[in-house]
Every structure is written in structure tokens, then in C-alpha cells.
Curated annotation (Swiss-Prot):
It comes from the Viruses. GO terms for molecular function: CD4 receptor binding; monoatomic cation channel activity. Its main location: host cell. This is Protein Vpu. The modification Phosphoserine is found at residues 53, 57.
Length: 82
């Protein structure tokens, strides 16, 4: 084969691999955003119910615990994951 078609095929394969990697990252980030929205909605419902009734709903707290969300101190300046 001539060198130009070989280079074109290699470039096409590399472009496809890069596209797969980029779209994989996009899908992962999109899932994170959806999960965070769900967590935010649950927290908002908890706050709303706590204001209405004076206590928190156990069902929604257990849903947050199942998702791995820690309740408590939420200080953005207090980062311990370094």
C-alpha cells in the first residue's frame, strides 16, 4: 500500500479511539450530574418537611444513606480528601 492510505487509516483509528474516550467521559460526568440532582432534590424535600413538621423524614434520610450521602457538616472550606 501507499504511505498516504496507511496514514489515513491510522488517523481514522486514532480519531475513533479519541471519540470513544471523550464520549465515555461525557457519559460518566452526565451520570454524576444526574445523581447530584437527585441528591439535591432529596435534601430539599428533607429541609422542606423539617420546616413543615419540625422533624425529618426517616424514609428520605435512608434513601440518602443508601446513595452514600453523608448528612451533617457541609463546609466547602473544610476539605479532608487530600
Amino acid at each position: 500500500m501507499q504511505p498516504i492510505p496507511i496514514v489515513a487509516i491510522v488517523a481514522l483509528v486514532v480519531a475513533i479511539i479519541i471519540a470513544i474516550v471523550v464520549w465515555s467521559i461525557v457519559i460518566i460526568e452526565y451520570r454524576k450530574i444526574l445523581r447530584q440532582r437527585k441528591i439535591d432534590r432529596l435534601i430539599d424535600r428533607l429541609i422542606e418537611r423539617a420546616e413543615d413538621s419540625g422533624n425529618e423524614s426517616e424514609g428520605e434520610i435512608s434513601a440518602l444513606v443508601e446513595m452514600g450521602v453523608e448528612m451533617g457538616h457541609h463546609a466547602p472550606w473544610d476539605v479532608d480528601d487530600l
